[in-house]
Amino acid sequence: MAQEPKYPVQTVMKALELLNHLAKNTGNLGAGVSELSDALGIGKSTVHRLLDTLQYYGYIEKSEETNRYRLGWELYKVGLSVPAQNQLFNIDRWPSPFSG
């Protein structure tokens, strides 16, 4: 893991903590505003603003039936781009059975 940033941006850190909580603790059920607020120690109004912003970008989605939030498809697409950028998965660097 990377070292802690010298000048962290608190809002970004809170948004990432929220995404990590949804990823690790809620499964397909998602989480409500109160649950996220309690789990992260963040005020409900801040959680609402974070959720609204993350939903706008497609990183989370809200179930209209349950009013709970879960990870969205845009976040999945971001994750898919990681292997393409990681040298461990760079096929050009793998040894070829045809090279001498």
Region annotations inferred by a language model:
Residues 2-83:
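N-terminal helix-turn-helix
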Residues 74-100:
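Conserved segment of winged-helix/HTH DNA-binding domains
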